[in-house]
Amino acid sequence: MNQKQKNIIERKTKDFCEEVKHLKLTEENKRIFNAFVYKRSKPYKFEIIDKYSNTIRFILCTNKLDDGVLHILLKHYQGKIGSVSATEILNLCEVIRNGEISVKENTMVYTLKQNGQIFKLIVALKKSKT
């Protein structure tokens, strides 16, 4: 990661905190918030049941530029491509819970239409060790 990217991430992290400081967060929201603010080296793990009764286990990486927290901060939060707010990020699990599902190659794409906006969340498929 270059210095310009580090500066952008630092600024956007501060903006993210400011945007949600007035909200009452659920436990799930707090975990997502922590992933975006504290960026620990271990990924954050989530388990959600979608509307099709599929149990979706996914990780939210905090140290990779091509997916997870850094990708969302650099490309989508306050961005021009697929722009999302901090509140929308905190509710990303709702896209899985309530969205329509499509499978493309090694990914599942959840799409949720809400308040005139379309939210997409891409989950990479990996074989379970269990």
Name these PLM-found stretches.
Residues 1-130:
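Ribonuclease/tRNase effector modules and their secretory precursors
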